[in-house]
Amino acid sequence: MALDNEAPVNSLGFAKSPAETRVVVAMSGGVDSSVVAAYLADQGYDVVGVTLQLYDHGAALAKKGACCAGIDIHDARRVAEERGFPHYVLDYENIFKDAVIDEFADSYLAGATPVPCIRCNERVKFKDLLETAKDLEADCMATGHYIQRKMGEHGPELHSAEDANRDQSYFLFSTTPEQLDFLRFPLGHLPSKDATREMAAQYGLSVADKPDSQDICFVPNGDYASVIQKLRPGAAEPGQIVHADGRVLGEHNGVIHYTIGQRRGLGIGGLSEPLYVVKLDVDQKQVIVGPKEMLATRRVPVREINWLGDAPFTSRDEWHLSVKVRSTRPPRDAIIRPISETEAEVELFSAEEGISPGQACVFYDPNGSRIYGGGWIWKGQ
């Protein structure tokens, strides 16, 4: 029997007033997280802004559009001053290097195409920062990600953003149920980024017209190879460009300069047929090229699976879901066959081109917006 004086639930799901609810907001210095902080402060919540200094490296520090570079820390602090809540900067450079940058470099050296933004969310923002938020006695942590947290029959669920063009679910598949219980995503229901900027203007935020961040924060101008060479001197060892039929077509200056599916910039012009990178043989220092049809893949082994379904992953022999194998591609119908709690074979109904080890394979409800988790692609067949 409910008591007459039972406290109403606030907008973040807590049975107490906003003033009694402490929220740590992860602030990158961009418009999205700034709007989240301003919105929650305006609603009367006890907001604490936290910005992570992740990377401080020459051009990357001053690079326009690099997440949590020097200018972004300044912008986050300024928003906190404008809206009247405390703001802290935490030095996470060593954690970020160990958990994200080193693996990024090693993955490229192994011939993979990594997605460091997922690892950053998984190992830094939603792990260490979340624990810091709890140390600050926060009730929850809010971010500016475009994704939705909805309450289901068995607890909180992860759902795609209302705006499909801004949806960041691919990059957040590794969010665990325990983390999801503590996280909040106030922007996930908005119809567009324009709505976010309108809110920023209404709050008078200095970042209202700030451009969106681009590329990977520690990779100035998208030049992956130069960053890897700095991190791993001697990584760019020359080798041969070889056709899948065995013909040697030319030389290259390092496997790190190539990715699966690449067509341009191969340095083997003058051929009658268009050729694509179909395999990177790191041991032999070879870049294997072939016709486009060689990129087509239907079977995708996946490991390090984070499962967000209600029933155990291995409770079924098959799961009929949709999957994304690249962030920019639409979900494809697939059958997921569990091998263990953290490993599976994914069979696509139709072949997909350019699937690369190191990318994520994210599981979606084929008839709705729910995300069922995902894992990491480690090879294609």
Curated annotation (Swiss-Prot):
InterPro entries: MnmA-like (IPR004506), MnmA-like_C (IPR046885), MnmA-like_central (IPR046884), MnmA-like_central_sf (IPR023382), Rossmann-like_a/b/a_fold (IPR014729). GO terms for molecular function: ATP binding; tRNA binding; tRNA-uridine 2-sulfurtransferase activity. It is found in: Cytoplasm. Residues 166-168 are annotated as: Interaction with tRNA. The keyword RNA-binding applies. It comes from the Bacteria. Keywords: ATP-binding, Cytoplasm, Disulfide bond, Nucleotide-binding, RNA-binding, Transferase, tRNA processing, tRNA-binding. CDD domains: MnmA_TRMU-like (cd01998). The keyword Glycoprotein does not apply. Its main location: cytoplasm. It is an enzyme of class 2 (transferase). GO terms for cellular component: cytoplasm. GO terms for biological process: tRNA wobble position uridine thiolation. Belongs to the MnmA/TRMU family. Catalyzes the 2-thiolation of uridine at the wobble position (U34) of tRNA, leading to the formation of s(2)U34. This is tRNA-specific 2-thiouridylase MnmA.
